[in-house]
Every structure is written in C-alpha cells, then in structure tokens.
C-alpha cells in the first residue's frame, strides 16, 4: 500500500459540491460519494479535518445584494454550513467513521463548540473533525476558515475539492476553450493575477503560514486519496 504524503489534512468542500448537478440543496448521492472518499483516506491513518461551505443553501453576499444587513446575511450562511456539516457527519458515521462536528457559534444541542486542543485530540484519535459555522464572524469566507483552521491545527496541506473544475486555469474553462490549467502556482501569483482560487484573505493567510494547497475535482471518485498520496492531480499552490 502506498504511504500518504500528508499526515494531517484540511479538506475544503464548497457547498456547491454537495449540491451536485441539481445546483441547490444536498444531493444524497454526492454526499455519500464524498463520505466514501473521506473514509478511504481515514483508513490510511490520515488525520482528516473538513471545512464545508454553505453556498448550496445560502450565500451571505447574495442576501446583502438583496438589501439585507450583511452581518445578518453572513450569519445565515454560517447556519447553512452547520446543516451541511451535520449531513456529512451522518453520512460518515453510517459507513463506520467516527466524526465530530465543532461549530464556531455555540449550539451545544447539535455539536461541540470549537476548541482547538479538543479538535487536535479528536484528530489524534483518528476521528474526522468537521469545522462548521465558518470563523463565527461575518465578512469572512469558509475559504478563510479553512486557512485559519489549517494553521491552528498545524495541517500539512489544504485539499480544495471543487465540483465544477479540476484545477486552476488562466481563464474560465467553461467559457474560454483556450484556457490553460496551471500545474503549480505561488500564492503571490494567485494574489497578483486575481486568480479565483480562494479569496485574498485566505490566500494571504496560507502564504504567511506556508500552508500548501491542492485544487482538484471532487467529482472524480478517488481524487481525494490521490491528492493525499501525492499523485499529480489538479493544481498545487504553495509558498511565495
């Protein structure tokens, strides 16, 4: 059996990835596929933390554009990530993977509050930990949550699993047929060229803490395991 390249990872799942082709809500087939892929790497003794977005249910930015108070709209988005996290927890536990959800906003009836040392202990016991409710603060994306939690738990890498693209391109491949995929990038490249990998706050946090990022498609089964084993998939972003 191949040895994993990374021992502790943060898997970043967009909310849209959980919606699948239906584009909204939670697609049971997709969430089951993601859970099975997480199980594959957990069985390699990789410590797995997950950050899930909420865009399949609600986006704070859209609410703000509709005239809502931005902070209130963002809090709604955080609650959407909790719904996704509980669905993923259920799917993982149905296939025998012990999972804990930790939320940045306290809701003890459904999940643990986020406590860094407790999260690390869960990981050391080979439990999957899902970080929900973003950072607990409005104006911060779940990409920034992934970068922040990766720094806090000293993860080796962030695995950014996308549903509509298999890496980072110099243009939108769904619009421009000449778009070229990057094999490797630096965070400075991402920031300078405005590439839509993650927002600038998240990119800067990863750069400052020297956390590598792999962007790949989650829709192809086995890709999460391939990324953990260090196979050449997607786009790798690192350093300055």
Swiss-Prot record:
Which superkingdom is the protein from? Bacteria
Quote the record's binding site residues for UMP: 54, 74, 135-142
Q: Where are the transmembrane segments?
A: none
The enzyme's E.C. designation: 2.7.4.22
Q: Where does ATP bind?
A: 12-15, 55, 59, 163, 169, 172
Q: Which UniProt keywords apply?
A: Allosteric enzyme, ATP-binding, Cytoplasm, Kinase, Nucleotide-binding, Pyrimidine biosynthesis, Transferase
> How the protein assembles, per its UniProt entry?
Homohexamer.
What name is this protein filed under?
A: Uridylate kinase
């Amino acid at each position: 059996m191949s040895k994993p390249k990374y021992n502790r990872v943060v898997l970043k799942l967009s909310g849209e990835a959980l919606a699948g082709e239906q584009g909204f809500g939670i697609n049971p087939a997709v969430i089951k596929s993601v859970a099975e892929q997480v199980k594959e790497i957990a069985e390699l003794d990789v410590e797995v933390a997950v950050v899930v977005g909420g865009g399949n249910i609600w986006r704070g930015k859209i609410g703000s554009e509709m005239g809502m108070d931005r902070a209130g709209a963002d809090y709604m988005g955080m609650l959407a990530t909790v719904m996704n996290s509980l669905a993923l927890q259920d799917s993982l536990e149905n296939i025998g993977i012990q999972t804990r959800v930790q939320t940045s906003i306290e809701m003890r009836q459904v999940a643990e509050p986020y406590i860094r040392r407790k999260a690390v202990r869960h990981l050391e016991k080979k439990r999957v930990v899902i970080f929900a409710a973003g950072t607990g603060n409005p104006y911060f994306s779940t990409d920034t949550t992934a970068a922040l939690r990766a720094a806090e738990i000293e993860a080796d890498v962030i695995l950014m699993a996308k549903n509509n693209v298999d890496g980072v391109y110099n243009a939108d491949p769904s619009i421009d047929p000449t778009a070229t995929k990057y094999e490797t990038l630096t965070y400075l490249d991402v920031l300078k060229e405005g590439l839509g990998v993650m927002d600038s706050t998240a990119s800067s946090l990863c750069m400052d803490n020297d956390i590598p990022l792999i962007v790949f498609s989650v829709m192809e089964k086995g890709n999460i395991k391939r990324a953990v084993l260090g196979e050449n998939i997607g786009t790798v972003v690192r350093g300055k």
